[in-house]
């Protein structure tokens, strides 16, 4: 997929791929930390991938103006997208913010912005790492 095609995707599609990419970052990180027991992997992964965690990261990013205008456009596209899925363990606002978070990961991945995606991951890691067991 080229950049133009990626930029035309709706927020839900961007969040769909962004969710998968972010999950891989988290799983690799946890394995690199030496976690191998499924219960510990799941417990710690949730601290990164839950809607509440992603909303916390976005809030921290907002405090320091981390997101570029380009990224904010795709965050809003994801956040404002009308999804047929409902929030499971959180409120609708938090769920929508997390969808925006995943949309940013999706657009960065699909447009091959690897360095910026790494910066996004590093910021996310720094924000959540203190909560790990």
Swiss-Prot record:
Which is an annotated GO molecular function term of this record?
Answer: ribonuclease III activity
Active site annotation, chain numbering: 19
Quote the function comment for this protein. Answer: Involved in correct processing of both the 5' and 3' ends of 23S rRNA precursor. Processes 30S rRNA precursor transcript even in absence of ribonuclease 3 (Rnc); Rnc processes 30S rRNA into smaller rRNA precursors.
Q: What is this protein called?
A: Mini-ribonuclease 3
Please report which protein family the annotation says this sequence is part of: Belongs to the MrnC RNase family.
Summarize subunit and interaction data from the UniProt record for this chain: Homodimer.
Point out the gene that encodes the protein: mrnC
InterPro entries of this UniProt entry? Mini3_fam, RNase_III_dom, RNase_III_sf
- Keyword line: Cytoplasm, Endonuclease, Hydrolase, Magnesium, Nuclease, Ribosome biogenesis, RNA-binding, rRNA processing, rRNA-binding
GO CC terms for this protein?
cytoplasm
Which cofactors go with this protein?
Mg(2+)
Q: What is its main location?
A: cytoplasm
